[in-house]
């Protein structure tokens, strides 16, 4: 009998491998959680409960997941720099390739800047980070009230920029995959060999 090892770990010329897919979808799911969690925590009175959890829980988890996302962004960048990418999908025109390249640049930049601005805000504001509600992380910058508001504003504005860039990315993929029926999304869909 022939052993089928399943999806390769590394990228192939025509599709992404298991590691690229895992990193891609992990980042997507966690950023989606961050947007939902941020909207709950900023609207929830501290003593109110949602699904049995109070506002502090959502803040602790938002900060903790942000640090996980920063780690995933670093892992993703290292993987991207050390593993060849698949070739461009043949359905992408030169202008579309330029758009994809710019979108990817923005996505990578935002994957780093969002967690960093969030971290700087909570540290400068003196709120700190209780990693997954277990242990307090040290504050290397100390309380800086003069610029915590600026960093918070930047963090929030960049969250909306990230939403726009993600929507543009998803829209382009859906246009190519669903409307034009090119099969483009199959390259990154999980559980596709």
Language-model features and meaning:
Residues 2-193:
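Membrane-embedded alpha-helical bundles that constitute the cytochrome b-like, heme-associated redox core
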């Amino acid at each position: 009998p022939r052993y089928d090892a399943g999806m390769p770990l590394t990228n192939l010329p025509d599709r992404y491998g298991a590691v690229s897919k895992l990193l891609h979808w992990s980042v997507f799911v966690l950023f989606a959680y961050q947007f939902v969690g941020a909207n709950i925590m900023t609207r929830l009175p501290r003593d109110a409960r949602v699904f049995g959890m109070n506002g502090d829980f959502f803040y602790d988890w938002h900060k903790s997941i942000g640090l996980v996302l920063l780690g995933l962004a670093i892992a993703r960048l290292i993987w991207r720099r050390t593993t060849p990418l698949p070739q461009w999908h043949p359905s992408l025109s030169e202008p579309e390739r330029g758009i994809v390249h710019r979108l990817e640049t923005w996505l990578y930049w935002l994957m780093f800047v969002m967690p960093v601005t969030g971290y700087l805000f909570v540290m400068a504001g003196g709120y700190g980070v209780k990693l997954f509600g277990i242990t307090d992380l040290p504050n290397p910058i100390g309380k800086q009230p003069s610029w915590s508001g600026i960093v918070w504003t930047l963090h929030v504005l960049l969250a909306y920029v990230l939403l726009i860039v993600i929507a543009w990315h998803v829209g382009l993929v859906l246009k190519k995959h669903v409307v034009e029926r090119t099969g483009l999304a199959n390259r990154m869909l999980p559980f596709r060999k």
